[in-house]
């Protein structure tokens, strides 16, 4: 029997592992296991991305599963602002989260993250904050480090080698069930039928495992609450248009309230000189973006997302988001790309029209089309209104050279109800990260794993 079993080797699981490793090296007699359905980070390969093809729908998606989780293939932004990247402050309080993020940052630095900080210059932030306000936008403080996808994978690989010195890691092993006896967790069962017993279990399956975790919570009688689903587009344009603000802040976090519908709209995942990519969630293909530390493109991309909150009797926002995404898949066999200029003038984009613009699409297999056949009028209106506001902040956004890809969707899992220690109503069962609906990014996910690990150590009588 293990003292602790961690399901998921993404940022939450890894940082929980680091905290347990620290306890072991301080003399605690702890046996711990990290389990993940995917392979080691250096063995993770996306055939579709490498060959420039449409998603192959592999049984185990290497973009989301394996050591490092989705974070290994992300843009590698280490966000240090407690207001960005999730809802952990509601669990821990602002000061505790700030401390956790600082400790997360120190570990990243130890394993090779760059020392350069973006967004820490108060004077530049205030300048852009005033300019944003004049354009009806709100700029959020977002202090971060940028690793890029290439360096992110290297850092995760070094972490793998370090954790294995004290913690057992079992990859290519899928957990299918969480086990309990009465009101206490007893372990997990793998797809191969192996029952792994543990005194405490931390479940951190990432967004890829969100639906599975929701099913497990239902069978275990654990309450969950609904998070919103964010739907929108990935915007791609010449990097020079955004350079004045991205050179200062790297990733400006901008919020907007639409005039027509009073809906919240925001920028997300800004990638200066990056590329647009696809990702796969269950049975739908969606769009995303990233950038490398090396290998820069002439384009910048970012998402514009509209938060969709649903009330009774509707209880399945994730299915709604997938429904909209499937419309794009149906019309294009994947992702639709449209010039903003064509959208504003009520016409579909064609290969010929795309070729007239200065922006060469970095997602080569996107199909030129018409996003108005995909998005509800309300969401499309929200997006267009924010693009026009952004054009006042960075002139040139509303132009013939701006491309819109759809659909970008962020399926923020149903939030698992926990106490302040991230323990569920089943004693000994803890949750963390994006898959539990607590976070939506690399840093807060890692912080949640660290917080959960310290709670587990305390519950087992270790310090």
Where are these regions (language model features)?
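Residues forming the flavin
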Residues: 2-82, 123-130, 135-463
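Dinucleotide-binding Rossmann-like beta1-alpha1 core, especially the glycine-rich loop
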Residues: 58, 65-118
């Amino acid at each position: 029997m293990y003292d602790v079993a961690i399901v998921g080797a993404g940022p939450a699981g890894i940082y929980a592992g680091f905290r347990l490793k620290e306890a072991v090296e301080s003399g605690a007699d702890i046996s711990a296991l990290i389990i993940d359905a995917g392979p080691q980070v250096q063995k993770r390969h996306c055939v579709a991305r490498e060959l420039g093809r449409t998603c192959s729908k592999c049984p185990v998606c290497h973009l989301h599963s394996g050591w490092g989780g989705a974070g290994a293939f992300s843009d590698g932004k280490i966000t240090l602002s407690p207001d960005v990247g999730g809802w952990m402050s509601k669990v821990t309080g602002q000061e505790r989260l700030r401390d956790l993020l600082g400790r997360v940052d120190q570990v990243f630095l130890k394993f090779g993250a760059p020392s350069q900080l973006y967004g820490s210059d108060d004077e530049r932030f205030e300048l852009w904050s005033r300019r944003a306000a004049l354009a009806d936008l709100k700029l959020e403080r977002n202090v971060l480090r940028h690793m890029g996808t290439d360096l992110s994978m290297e850092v995760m690989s070094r972490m793998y080698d370090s954790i294995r010195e004290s913690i057992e890691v079992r990859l290519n092993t899928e957990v299918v069930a969480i086990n309990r006896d009465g009101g206490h967790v007893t372990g997990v069962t793998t797809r191969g039928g192996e029952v792994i017993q543990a005194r405490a279990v931390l479940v951190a399956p990432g967004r890829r495992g969100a639906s599975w975790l929701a099913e497990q919570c239902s069978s275990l009688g654990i309450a969950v609450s609904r998070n919103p689903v964010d739907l929108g587009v990935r915007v791609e344009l010449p990097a020079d248009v955004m350079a004045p603000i991205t050179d200062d802040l790297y990733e400006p976090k901008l919020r907007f309230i639409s005039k027509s519908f009073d809906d919240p709209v925001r920028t997300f995942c800004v990638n200066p000189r990056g590329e647009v990519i696809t990702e796969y969630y269950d049975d739908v293909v969606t769009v995303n973006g990233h950038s490398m530390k090396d290998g820069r493109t002439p384009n910048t991309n970012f998402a514009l997302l509209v938060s969709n909150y649903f009330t009774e009797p509707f209880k399945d926002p994730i299915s709604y988001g997938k429904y909209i995404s499937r419309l794009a898949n149906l019309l294009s066999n994947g992702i639709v790309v449209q010039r903003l200029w064509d959208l504003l003038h009520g016409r579909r984009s064609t290969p010929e029209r795309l070729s007239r613009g200065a922006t060469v699409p970095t997602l080569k297999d996107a199909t030129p089309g018409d996003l108005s056949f995909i998005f509800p009028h309300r969401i499309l209106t929200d997006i267009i209104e924010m693009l026009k506001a952004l054009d006042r902040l960075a002139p040139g956004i509303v132009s013939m050279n701006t491309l819109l890809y759809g659909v970008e969707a962020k399926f923020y899992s149903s939030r698992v109800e926990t106490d302040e220690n991230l323990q569920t109503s089943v004693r000994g069962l803890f949750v963390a990260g994006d898959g539990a609906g607590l976070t939506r990014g690399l840093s807060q996910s890692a912080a949640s794993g660290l917080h959960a690990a310290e709670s587990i150590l305390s519950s087992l009588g270790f310090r």
